[in-house]
Amino acid sequence: MLRKQTPGRARPADVEAVAAVSALGKVMNQDGTALDHSKVRKRESMLPTRGRSGRGGVRRASAESAGRRTRSEDGKAARSARERHMEDEFNAFGGRATAGVAKEVPARGGADDGPVMTTKYVPSPRGLVKVTVPVSAGSSAHSSLRKSASIHTGMNMRHGSGSRRASMTSAGSDAARRQAKSTAESSSARTRSNKPKPRPSGDSHSPSPTTRAPVTPRRTTVKDLVAPPLPEEPEDSVSTSGKGESIVPLNEKEEEQDEQPFDSEANARSSPKTPKQGGHVPALEVSQHGFQTPVPDGPTMAEYLQSADPILSAGATQRQRELEEAEAASTTPDGDRLKIGKSPSPMKSAMKNSPSAGTSKYNRPPLDTSSAADGAYLSLTTAENTRLNAQLSDDKMRKSPTLRQPKRRVSVHSPKTPSAASADRSSKVLRQFSLSKPQGRTLAMNKNNSGEKQAQSPTSPKSNQKKVDPSVLYPREPPKKKSSFERERPQHKNLGFKNLSLRSEASNEFMYQGTLEGEIHQSPGQHVGHETPKKALLSVTAEGWKSRFSDSDSENDSPPFSSNASGSTQPSSHRDSSLAHHGGFGLFKHKDHHGHKPKHSLGASLASAKPHEPQKARLAPTSNRGSNTLSAERPLKNHNSFSGKLKKLFGKKHAT
């Protein structure tokens, strides 16, 4: 049901619309000016039966079809009333016969007043121009026929009347061709004259649309170029008779323009204030009138344009004034000319400073060039220019013209040097030294290139580095540390604690080297000096100091001190005893007042064990006795200073 209702509701609107349009077309007469409303109503009354027969209304006698018919009839009545209103308004403006480009306007006074006139819109350089042209009865019939054919074209295609459509379109095309010819002639005449024709006194009440006006000349211009000229008809003669007054002077003016093409163009440019009006444009007449009285032996075109244009005339007067000044300058005496030629600044040319240098060269008479004064002037200016060019070519002048100032300062101070007092000699030497530096710089800049300057800059720090000893600048690198928990140690060092020693290797090697140097470089008469550290150590142990490494459980270690007096000659026993009892380092601090840092204990033990060695003996061994005797006095001072540092750190005096 739904599928059948949807197309059934859409069909009646299309069929009824087509039927209404066809009824309106058949009711209209040929001119399309009036409608017989009685015929329209009869046609509308016939439309429902035609619509019902078209869609099979006999078989559908249900309530839905009856309701659909009532709705369609109501809509059709409203639509017909709307269409009647639109047709009445359309006929009030002239109907379908006057809807094209050409529009027939009936004469007001009747048929006896004159021929039927028609208004046309013709394109011109200034836009569309409205023209009234007389039209014969045949052309009006053709135009009305063409309009009716354009109206009924859609209808004939639906009803299948192809032969009638072809005949009507052919007749309409003939009428269009004739009308196009007349419009093309009028448009070409207007483009040549560049002025519109005078409008007639009678105004038309029915305006025509301007949308179709540009379409007609486009089609006609192409046909005019291709088709041969057709023989003139009586209506064309009538139309040309109306145009006769404007065409005849046009040809005469064209001939005059061909005779003088350049003058008219120049005059058109030189007279910008040409009046532009819609009806009459007298531009060509004014231009021709201006050239009717030419001057036979007058100025040229350029001079004429200069006189016409105020800007060019002002420039010409200024140029004439400059020429007069140049002539006046060329007649000045030679003495004044030499004064003018002198240049205040050395960087400019002497020829450029004189105002008459450029103009007198061309405006000077030929007899004046052979005078002796001019030759002397030229020679002087040439010599001046040569001298200036030589200064510019100098490298010192081009690169750094301000570097000559220090030399002038030296020359100013030089006569004062012999008369200066002795108190000012030091300041004078400093001043001369400061002045000699820029002089050396100027010589280096003039002699050396930029590459040599860069080569000199890195050489200066190298010479300074050679003088300074690198051992002073950088400290000695300590030896590589080994793990203190190594079980296998080298036997040649003979360290006191071989099993898991917590002592650093660097301190052991340092102490070992110091003892070896002291024993090797000592003479045999100095054995008493070796026993002094043992006595010091015995005094320390007598006071109650004990090493935490000398334990009863240690089996490998030797007793702290042997009763042998010859222990001083054995470096191994002396070294073991000194390391075991006095040079120990611990991870844990003693809580008693005797415990102190390993650094200070090491320094104190070294200072007390070797009083005969200076601190410098650790780096370089001493070979002579004089140095040993002198160094024996120094450790006391070092010991006192070290104990003072301990007092400051701990606030207690340690017995050493």
From Swiss-Prot:
Main location: membrane
Compositionally biased region (Polar residues): 351-372, 433-463, 557-572, 621-631
Subcellular location: Cell membrane
Biased composition (Basic residues): 399-411, 588-600, 645-656
Biased composition (Low complexity): 136-150, 182-191, 206-219
Keyword Protein transport carried by entry: no
Sequence segments annotated as region (Disordered): 28-95, 135-375, 387-656
Start-end of Basic and acidic residues biased regions: 66-88, 477-491
Biased composition (Acidic residues): 253-262
Single GO cellular component term: plasma membrane
Alphabetical UniProt keywords: Cell membrane, Membrane
UniProt topology in membrane: Peripheral membrane protein
Function comment: Important for the stabilization of eisosomes, large cytoplasmic protein assemblies that localize to specialized domains on the plasma membrane to cluster specific proteins at sites of membrane invaginations.
Subunit composition and interactions: Component of eisosomes, large cytoplasmic protein assemblies that localize to specialized domains termed MCCs on the plasma membrane.
Protein family according to the UniProt entry: Belongs to the SEG1 family.
Protein name, per record: Eisosome protein SEG1
